[in-house]
Amino acid sequence: MKRNGTRLNFAKANSTKSGSTRARDLMNKMSIIPEWHSLYSNTRKLPCSRPHSSPCKMQRTIFQDLCRPSSSTTAIANPVLSYLDIERILAQKISSRRDDIKKVFQILDRNHNQMVTKGDLKRVITAFLIPLTKDQFQDLLAQIPISSLGNVPYLEFLSRFGGGIDININGIKRVNENEVDNRRTVKEVQLTEKIFRNMRSIRKVFQVMDVNNTGLVQPQELRRVLETFCLRMQDGDYEKFLEQYNIDKTTAVDYNAFLKNLSVKNDASFKYLLSNAAELSRETQQGKNGKRLLDTGSSEDVWKNYSLDDLEKTFCQEFSKSYEKIEKALSAGDPSKGGYISLNYLKVVLDTFIYRLPRRIFIQLIRRFGLKTSTKINWKQFLTAIYERQKLEVSKTLPLKKRSSTEARNRSRKENIIKKLFKYSEDRYTALKKTLLIISSTPSGHITWEELRHILNCMVAKLNDSEFSELKQTFDPEGTGAVRVNSLLDVLDDSTKVRKMSPSTDTKTPLPVAWDSVEELVLDSITRNLQAFYSMLQSYDLRDTGTIGKNNFRKVMRVFCPYLSNEHLVRFSSKFQEAGSGRILYKKFLLSIGVGIPPPTPPLSSPKVQLSDQFQIEEPGQQDERTQPSGEKTSEINNMTKEEVIDGLKHRIQQKDPVFRKQFLSISKEPDVKINQEEFRKVLERSGMPMNDCQYAMLASKLGFKNEEGMSYQDFTMGFEDCMLSGLETVPLQSRTASRTNMDEHFISAEECLRIFPKKLKESFRDVYSAFFRIDLDRDGIISMHDFHRLLQYLQLNMVDLEFERFLSLLGLRLSVTLNFREFQNLCEKRPWKSDEAPQRLIRCKQKVADSELACEQAHQYLIMKAKTRWADLSKNFIETDNEGNGILRRRDIKNSLYGFDIPLTPREFEKLWQNYDTEGRGYITYQEFLHRLGIRYSPKVHRPYKEDYFNFLGHFTKPKQVQEEIQELQQISEREKLMNHYEEISKAFNAMEKSKPVALCRVQKVLQECGCPLKEEELISLLKSLDVSVHNNHIDPVEFLRALEISWASKARPKEKEESSPPPISFSKVTPDEVIKTMQEVVESSQPALVEAFSALDKEDTGFVKAMEFGDVLRSVCQKLTDNQYHYFLRRLRLHLTPNIHWKYFLENFSTFQDETADDWAENMPKAPPPMSPKETAHRDIVARVQKAVASHYHTIVQEFENFDTLKSNTVSRDEFRSICTRHIQILTDEQFDRLWSELPVNAKGRLKYQDFLSKLSIERVPSPPMAAGDSGESTMAQRGSSAPEFSQGTRSNLYSPPRDSRVGLKSRSHPCTPVGTPPLQNCEPIESRLRKQIQGCWRELLRECKEKDTDKQGTISAAEFLALVEKFKLDISREESQQLIVKYDLKNNGKFAYCDFIQSCVLLLKAKETSLMRRMRIQNADKMKEAGMETPSFYSALLRIQPKIVHCWRPMRRSFKTYDKNGTGLLSVADFRKVLRQYSINLSEEEFFHVLEYYDKSLSSKISYNDFLRAFLQ
């Protein structure tokens, strides 16, 4: 003891001590400390200013610290810890202190029902295990079943979290009963000793029981604690114990004073125990290899006197002692068998079994082992790195002895020999030293002279006989035939003449080393360390390809053959380099040098055993055996007998060893494929069980293995288990007829397979994709049920064919079904389908199936399965119906369904599939025909066309009760329509009744049923309520009921009368040229008001003239299907085909009187040209043109100028401020010119310019088109012209700002369609909504409630006046003009109603675009994927970027709305319908931005928009 303490003090004082001495002192210090820590694990960190002179004194200090009250140190929970970290910590700590914690729970379990309260559980966890936050504790409670009273079963808690690392804590040696003080009984001594052992636990139990922190416990509770943790005592013994420590059993006990008094009274015995513990530790330290070492704390002050080299050596030495436990613990932390664990888990394991290192030093050590600390740790690579480091960095230092004069002379002589030895080459010194270090790590530490000469000839130079004899005489004067390697290393280290050798003046060149000698030396080095060499190569080849990188190959060769020069390495690399990739074929390299591929290392083998196996160097007396070839010797050592192999196989089969199974299946590929005897022998060799021919023949005979029949893995496991049960009698495995019960044990039922399949899949594969990739052998992205069956066999889920079919039926599958990856993933994970995911066809194209017939059959079977099980999903693309309302299917419907379920077909394959359905070639099929082809019976209630649920879109704001009410209302509407269809029968039946008396509901129900309207009682009551018919005591007034029916009938019949009264539209498609003029006169006469309005909109100056092209556009808008030939014929007849400008007023007034006989006179009387303008008018128009051109070319600059002047943010500027802007950007205007320009601008009541209106009117010109002629289909062909720089011609308007009228009209020959009459323009209200968002988010519930109260019809709309009243009531910060913009935007049905649901949704839901990097911004659909793409402008891009979140949020219902308007299924919409859908979903687009969108998606001016191209731009 004294010697150890002196050594520790000396290590502290002498900072210049060598690294090896420090390491030994550290080992001595660490070997003493754990003996006391085994008594008190997890103690607090103790300050250590200097090493203690004796462990007794140090441990007494620790004990005194433990006996102090711990209230001063409050445990703080770590909120960063995840649930997995907490579970791991609990598993570790509970496994080490299970008994103590169980005893604590038993004390707290006063009712003895194995239950504790949640508060008791949390206090026990905080005191004994780890402090938790409230959320962490709630997460932990969620994993435990809780009783109805809220109590927790603590046994369930211990069972659930009691796994993990098995930490065995050894206590100190018990006191011999003969050495007990005579004044105390044996019971008292035993009780005292047990209190010492459980001091910390007992203190924590007292604190747990002391809920109020008073420091007191009741005497009966004190006895319960002592009897639970220590031993049971009789009443007499317990009373003596209380007298010994002055405890009154009638009052509360101060447990802190009790523990302190206990420590003082037993101080002498305590010292004795500590001295015994220290002596035991010092005496048994060298003999115990597997003992764990724990330091006194994690403070870096304890470690600062030790270098990293010393810590690394000591760490490696202690690591080998607990290798098996560490490997088991690391394997337990890798449940997925992926080979990776977290850095924190690795530190917990190493702290448990080796040292509790500070984190900074731990990370430095990990980096020295070649591992990255920023990612997860490959624990197998970590074990290999430590094993290699331990093998190569064995401690070389030996204790120095006093040299005699003879020894000095011998050393001088040896140094002279070494100097002569290295006279040829100095750079060989380091390589020779590394080689000798490897040899010195062997158990014997000797090398024969023949081996040494061989090494010197290869590495240094070829020695002649005289030089070698001199070397041999110097180091081996006794002639033993071998030399100690350490003696050579000693001379190499201490010879300053060798280490500081001056440059040689000898001109003699070094002797070259022969290549044959180098190959022999490499072969010898690799043979000695074959397993380690091959393991290190495999660590760089995780996929077992047989190749590694050139740099990695050099690293491995440098480790095991450090004497190789760069030339040698280049020669080796080039000789075995793969041509294509440049990688090294290391297996070919091993075979070429005659080594061969070694069998894999058996699992859980200790590095110490591996070291002894790899460095088999015998004692000097065994020189004859050393001269034998290394290959024969290795085979003799490694070959196993028949009994050993049978034991090994038995162990592997019982443990279901995955390594052995993988080796077997690597040859057989499948569990049911048979292999022959030679292949089975390879399996044994790869599994670390090599055998010679004789032993293997005996094993095959014992197992009954027949080469002609072969054996599969299933046969082997089943038969080998039978052999184990019967004592391995000689019965052939394949011919064994097992009993029925034994066979049933290996086959499971379909229900059991369904239950354990997800768990097995998770254990065997890293993820679902790995399993899919494993069974998809042809890599076509589709697996069959045969592939699925192979997967079950791979997971050892064996079923008979009948059960497998039942298993598929439970999953909703059949034998003929195929699955793609997404379906397989949903099958395995049961994850919900994301509604906002884009269809797979819009993301990427799938691989095509090569076989056309197989592809069609697979698609057909897939449609059968979906039609049976998921018709609702399949029918999402089936929306078309015929005139009678029956559902029909076209090519695109089935194609979209297949693509939606990721079943892609080539056009040829799909055409073949469609021909099987549409046998008559009509282009469509009915639902009945489609289901008949699928072999499914048609049901009208089930197989209906898909209908979109309107309320799903507003579900964010709609409560479930409200949804139910609205659905009931829709049902009532359909029931009311049924009543209207049978109005006459119902009216006759009720008129026949006696109207003076009320009618019972049951009679009303019966009458309606007789009239063809069967209704349930609940449906009838709700229908009467919707008709405002009162019900009293289940009776109604028949007169009131008839009056309500009459009102509904009249309102329904009125629209039909209007439709019947409207004349059919006139079509010019079948009009002959001779009838064109007459037909045109009829159309012009009937469409006179619309033509006047359209021409007036074009003739801003009221000159009566329009351009000939504009004149033709207007006529085409009212004349359906008017061809160009008919129009040109019409102009020639009117003598107007050469006229650039046409007087439209004259045409409308006199066209009805036109005749061919007076055509010349009629044309001559028409005015020819507009009147000339005055010079002032011309100058003014030029100024207006300059203003518009300046705004178009410097838009952002002018906007910035306006905003700079608008300091009050009122969107207005003064007259002088606007004039300064005109002077700067346009031209200097005279007072007269500016006054005239100012008079045409939008000015408010205060005389300030509203610059927002000014800019919008200049940047875009909107024109309301004339009303359609009677009978028009509603598809507007009118167009809107707008751009950033409008063109000006002779007919430029005189007024810059004219609110009631817009700029001009054009048709598809010049511009895009415009807003039809009655359709409000698009509005961009995003700035208004952004400003209102904060205000409405605080009161949107009250606002929604008010709107619902005003919405009596529950249509989701209120009147504009009611909305303005709510704006005033909630004091929303918007002006009158902004309110009008909102009303226009949210008037979705053009009926003057405000859609409050859409408004609130836009203001409450803050939709943001997905945050992506600059390299992955939103891309617009490529032009090559579209037929024609227009110009890409900044305004176009800014508009798309702004509306992207809204489109992504509602693109699915929007697409279905597009399809509803696209009745012909062409994928194209008219501009009017496209605008309607955008308004329906409240898309924030101004008219200018809408024009840019049209300009891009309708470059050809066809007035048709591809809505798929539009949506695809947002979904990429």
From Swiss-Prot:
It comes from Mus musculus (Mouse). Residues 1422-1516 are annotated as: Interaction with AR. Its main location: nucleus. Ca(2+) 3 binds at residues 776, 778, 780, 787. Negatively regulates the androgen receptor by recruiting histone deacetylase complex, and protein DJ-1 antagonizes this inhibition by abrogation of this complex. Microtubule inner protein (MIP) part of the dynein-decorated doublet microtubules (DMTs) in cilia axoneme, which is required for motile cilia beating. SMART domains: EFh. Residues 1318-1516 are annotated as: Interaction with PARK7. InterPro entries: EF-hand-dom_pair (IPR011992), EF_Hand_1_Ca_BS (IPR018247), EF_hand_DJBP (IPR015070), EF_hand_dom (IPR002048), EFCB6 (IPR052603). Residues 96-131, 197-232, 321-356, 444-462, 528-563, 674-690, 763-798, 905-940, 1086-1121, 1193-1228, 1229-1264, 1348-1373, 1374-1409, 1454-1484, 1485-1516 form the EF-hand domain. This is EF-hand calcium-binding domain-containing protein 6. Ca(2+) 4 binds at residues 1462, 1464, 1466, 1473. GO terms for molecular function: calcium ion binding. Ca(2+) 2 binds at residues 210, 212, 214, 221. GO terms for biological process: flagellated sperm motility. Residues 12-21, 628-638, 1274-1297 have a biased composition (Polar residues).
